[in-house]
Amino acid sequence: MEVKMDELVLDVDVEEATGSELLVKSEPEADLNAVKSSTDLVTVTGPIGKNGEGESSPSEPKWLQQDEPIALWVKWRGKWQAGIRCAKADWPLTTLRGKPTHDRKKYCVIFFPHTKNYSWADMQLVRSINEFPDPIAYKSHKIGLKLVKDLTAARRYIMRKLTVGMFNIVDQFPSEVVSEAARDIIIWKEFAMEATRSTSYHDLGIMLVKLHSMILQRYMDPIWLENSFPLWVQKCNNAVNAESIELLNEEFDNCIKWNEVKSLSESPMQPMLLSEWKTWKHDIAKWFSISRRGVGEIAQPDSKSVFNSDVQASRKRPKLEIRRAETTNATHMESDTSPQGLSAIDSEFFSSRGNTNSPETMKEENPVMNTPENGLDLWDGIVVEAGGSQFMKTKETNGLSHPQDQHINESVLKKPFGSGNKSQQCIAFIESKGRQCVRWANEGDVYCCVHLASRFTTKSMKNEGSPAVEAPMCGGVTVLGTKCKHRSLPGFLYCKKHRPHTGMVKPDDSSSFLVKRKVSEIMSTLETNQCQDLVPFGEPEGPSFEKQEPHGATSFTEMFEHCSQEDNLCIGSCSENSYISCSEFSTKHSLYCEQHLPNWLKRARNGKSRIISKEVFVDLLRGCLSREEKLALHQACDIFYKLFKSVLSLRNSVPMEVQIDWAKTEASRNADAGVGEFLMKLVSNERERLTRIWGFATGADEEDVSLSEYPNRLLAITNTCDDDDDKEKWSFSGFACAICLDSFVRRKLLEIHVEERHHVQFAEKCMLLQCIPCGSHFGDKEQLLVHVQAVHPSECKSLTVASECNLTNGEFSQKPEAGSSQIVVSQNNENTSGVHKFVCKFCGLKFNLLPDLGRHHQAEHMGPSLVGSRGPKKGIRFNTYRMKSGRLSRPNKFKKSLGAVSYRIRNRAGVNMKRRMQGSKSLGTEGNTEAGVSPPLDDSRNFDGVTDAHCSVVSDILLSKVQKAKHRPNNLDILSAARSACCRVSVETSLEAKFGDLPDRIYLKAAKLCGEQGVQVQWHQEGYICSNGCKPVKDPNLLHPLIPRQENDRFGIAVDAGQHSNIELEVDECHCIMEAHHFSKRPFGNTAVLCKDISFGKESVPICVVDDDLWNSEKPYEMPWECFTYVTNSILHPSMDLVKENLQLRCSCRSSVCSPVTCDHVYLFGNDFEDARDIYGKSMRCRFPYDGKQRIILEEGYPVYECNKFCGCSRTCQNRVLQNGIRAKLEVFRTESKGWGLRACEHILRGTFVCEYIGEVLDQQEANKRRNQYGNGDCSYILDIDANINDIGRLMEEELDYAIDATTHGNISRFINHSCSPNLVNHQVIVESMESPLAHIGLYASMDIAAGEEITRDYGRRPVPSEQENEHPCHCKATNCRGLLS
């Protein structure tokens, strides 16, 4: 019987999302339940377990005598909690070892789904789940019933734990431990898939035997292999409960020679087995998880797809695709339990898929019931598919893929209209990563913005794109001498970075360059071709992918057949998998309710109007006479909306013709309903409005529009001159690389440059638009157009002239000769206005002046090849950061950082100036000899004759000086001089002789270039003495070198190391190097040390007590260490009534330092707090709460799970910070008005652990009693652990508040004063126990704390009975001070 995962998965947080009706129970219902509970208590229950043997007594209810999971109420710590009585086969080994020894009572194992704990419970303290005992641990009985709705949670949890235990063993194996056949990642993926499909303990025993067969025998204990191995195999094949599996797993773990395995793993250059395994092991274990929060909702394919099931995927880091199998295959998986049978499961499963949709199979399906019999088989229908594995081959050989399924993605057709789901996961499957896309789908769609093209991608293309096996590793070597870890390219032995660049074929420019389609072109295509192409479905003249009936019917067809004929009901669907008519009344346009209002009728969020205007929709709706016509209008609007959303997407690379064919196909599926007619009406009505609002022009006939009125009309020119690939080209516009700022004339050259030079995939963020007249850079066309209109109005004038698609001569294909300095100019005979007279012969760019053309030719066409190897840099521009985002950024697909190329952006002005000088010189010598070139015309609008003559004189003077100036050295010149130099004096001397005056300390740049090339130099360091006796010539005008100040030197000034001067005023104070820790707030003067260490050796760092004003005061000094007892651990008060037991798990890490990928504490935290973020907003999935410097990065409001003494790691583990004690240097001092306080003696960085708040742990009753006893003084050492601090309380229902009193027992945290702007933040830290009162309260720096600054925290506001009671004035003196402190 098929059981849905959604009905069997426990969701702890579901009651929070279902509404307030689950949280509060009405009073009449409570009274009725109370009467019912008392009646049921008499009739159902009775004396339980009174015999001394512990056997079932005759009076024991029948519902407790069966050995099966049963939901019941358990009295735990005075309150009734919902739990599951486990079957004996599901009792864990650790629980059995802790069984109570009291023989007079009868006990059973209870599983609490809320805390995932097993515990023994007295049978006298249980009640039937149908009763309503009181008091309960929840807000209502309904919440407790929802927790135990899934009776299989206990078995699934223990089976998941056992499976993870096997995965942990595999994590410790190097590659030499396993056999040769088992060193392929596909083998381990199949092993993991078989383990996740285990339905019984017998299957887990077989998996243990299979795991043993993959390990080499020399790493196993020979005595165990000889004596105990046959019996162990027999026990594995006969395993029937969790206890036997845990014992067999422990025995298998003990027989491995871990010392030899560890020696292999510690050897250098020995890679650990399956590095990919560690990235998705936790995700495999999550398929057994009892939480449903991370599962994405995927639309169910149709009845004749390859898998007739819901696709489940993880949001965080899904690596596998989970598919639901049919019920008819469950018998195969249960009956065939031998090792040979397990390997044949998949072939049997896929071979039986051919007849799953037959009428006989449909009759055999039974409704799902929440019974233990149905729940125990919930994994019988799970199949995990790995891309490229043998399962895909089995699918192909069995002929499951239908020919008619190979043209369009069917998952799009199954999206119900008006579903109203706003948080659906994208259903695109990424073949290269072997997982589903983790982004959220667009509102009203099933794809995200990145995978919109998947709607039009055929299945045959997807199958061809995914290789059967993974590519081999690259054979290249990195610059560090290690082996490259990338995959090699198909057909090569190296990756893209290490492939040989000689003889490589350039990529095809025609297919790599994609431009944005015009709306006008789409409009015209739909208008002219729709009447002819919209044919009834099934006719031979239709497109090939229209022949997919009957399985290819859209959800609109299903809606058209099953929609309610009542005009006042909504047409939306209440289900994602099939069309279920909505029962709500239609309140919007007589078709939709509030929940199912389509996206194209909602308010636009991009600052523009809707794609489908509300007025047009209302006009068309008024013309509909029947409900069928309204449904057809709805379908047409949905097709129109999705088409233009995909067309306007910048990331959609699907050709426009394919998208239009898809729209025509969708409209032709129901030709009788008139969907095509409504679509044509939409096209005719919306064409003019979309053309006007979205910034597109219909052609060159609109070019006479005023530029000042419609700036976006300039885009019309970009689509008229499109002879070659540069369709987005203006005469004044060029392209530049956003990484290195190299200039390019064509976009395709920029794409090749980014891919070959920077080894990254080209994206829009890699491209900058460049203004050719002035060289400025811009992020988008709007900014460039505004700049050109304001700064270069003559360039805008050319946009009003009729565009010329073809240049006069056809010599553009000629290639310039290398090193040629001749400038070829082609005059435009048709241009009579004097604008853009000079045209470049090689690229077609037009220029007003001949020098502009000369500089362009010198910069772009003087290299040996247009797309050759690395040539000289094109120079830096001066408006580098004028981009849309304001800074250089990179797309998410980039795998390399910008650090490797950041140094190239600096110090490039010299190279650019050299190139400009060469161009000016060539223009001066050859400008007068050029034949056939007319001089530039004067523009009387801007300059008069006097100004023009004056400018010519100034330009002649500047040109003469520029020609006499020497060139600046480039990187090659500096590097060549540094290679042959003996010291920095030699470097500067050789460069000055060749290039003249140089910038100061150019030897540092030379040393940096040598370091990048692997040349080791020492002469750049201070104090280096040349072996050849070179002595530097000291310039008296140079400033003294900078010398860092000494620590705590408040008034010291850095002077020259070679001179000893006592005149401090002769040296400018700007020579001092001031750092952050020099600005100390700690007063320096006569400070009296009262105590050298207030902890008296209990802390690893001594903490002194000082009094700054003791010498100026006549009062006797106080001794604050005498009024309390210094302790390093909190004391549990008897009022808590809590046994200090160990409820914290130990991690399975075997090394001295844990890894966040394999540590169980990180895994447990990820399950409890899936939405946790760090202080930068990033997810905390598979990350420690501390960084590499043991500073906390976890956001406030979440607890910290640290490793404990039971773990195998040492105290140097990254996940051990609080338990290591105080490390910062602190001191207790007397404040002006707040008594004693605590301040820093050194600079404390943000996130550093300062101290722990320690004292006596009390309940609220005892805390209130002590407050009354202490009185209403100005000093209180009681810290309330309420909902604002108790982070663990979010996991527990009705968690009681408690307090920590540091009055008589405490540490230095009792001296921390209050501030409304504190510099500390508190976290609950779990170390020894998961109980909230046993957690530690850690105080961490929330900002950088300077030396001498007081350490403060926020006491918060505690509710008081009256406003005048227990309120004290606040002395923090912060800008946001609240004034009063309660």
Curated annotation (Swiss-Prot):
The entry describes its oligomerization and partners as: Component of a regulatory complex with LDL1/SWP1. Interacts with LDL1/SWP1.
Q: What is this protein called?
A: Histone-lysine N-methyltransferase SUVR5
> Which amino acid positions bind Zn(2+) 4, per UniProt?
1316, 1370, 1372, 1377
Zn-finger (C2H2-type) residues: 735-758, 769-792, 838-861
**Which reactions is this enzyme annotated as catalysing?**
L-lysyl-[histone] + S-adenosyl-L-methionine = N(6)-methyl-L-lysyl-[histone] + S-adenosyl-L-homocysteine + H(+)
Biological processes annotated in GO: chromatin remodeling; methylation; negative regulation of gene expression, epigenetic
Q: Which InterPro entries match?
A: Post-SET_dom, Pre-SET_dom, SET_dom, SET_dom_sf, SUVR5_Znf-C2H2_3rpt, Znf_C2H2_type
Q: Which domain of life is it from?
A: Eukaryota
Per the UniProt record, the source organism is Arabidopsis thaliana (Mouse-ear cress)
Q: Which residue spans traverse the membrane?
A: none
A single GO molecular function, which one? histone H3 methyltransferase activity
Residues that bind Zn(2+) 2, according to the entry? 1147, 1182, 1203, 1207
Read off the PANTHER family from this record.
Answer: HISTONE-LYSINE N-METHYLTRANSFERASE SUVR5
Q: What does this protein do?
A: Histone methyltransferase that functions together with its binding partner LDL1/SWP1 as one of the regulators of flower timing in Arabidopsis. Mediates H3K9me2 deposition and regulates gene expression in a DNA methylation-independent manner. Binds DNA through its zinc fingers and represses the expression of a subset of stimulus response genes. May represent a novel mechanism for plants to regulate their chromatin and transcriptional state, which may allow for the adaptability and modulation necessary to rapidly respond to environment or developmental cues.
Residues involved in Zn(2+) 1 binding: 1147, 1149, 1154, 1159
